[in-house]
Swiss-Prot record:
Subcellular localization, as worded in the UniProt entry: Membrane
Entry keywords, A to Z: Chromosome partition, Membrane, Transmembrane, Transmembrane helix
Protein name: Uncharacterized protein YCR041W
Entry keyword annotation includes Lipid biosynthesis: no
Organism: Saccharomyces cerevisiae (strain ATCC 204508 / S288c) (Baker's yeast)
């Protein structure tokens, strides 16, 4: 089950990373690190600080939408809100908001 969830997350990540700003090498390394950290997060939800730590260790400019994406995943894991139809609609709206923010190219450096 975890393998499929992480694969889906990896596919979703393809649509939010800023291709125009990062080199392919930097993009690939950060994507792998982030997907691995999310996989560990699914196994051990109490380690919610792991995703920001990966961002910190890579010393990269991070799009605001990526942090919101990770935050949304943490909330889903912690409160298990992916089960009901209403919550699925909320998550869909939230991801649309994330993609909109990403189009604005709002970035900051951790």
């Amino acid at each position: 089950m975890l393998k499929y969830v992480v694969t889906d997350i990896g596919k979703m990540c393809l649509y939010i990373w800023p291709y125009r700003v990062w080199s392919w090498r930097r993009l690939f390394i950060f994507r792998v690190l982030n997907v691995v950290s999310i996989a560990i997060l699914f196994e051990t939800p109490h380690r919610l600080a792991l995703v920001p730590n990966v961002c910190l260790y890579t010393h990269m400019a991070i799009p605001l939408s990526t942090c919101l994406f990770c935050l949304c995943l943490c909330i889903c894991i912690k409160y298990d809100i992916t089960q009901t139809q209403a919550n699925n609609q909320f998550l869909a709206s939230f991801f649309v908001l994330i993609l909109t923010i990403n189009d604005l190219d709002v970035t900051f450096v951790i």
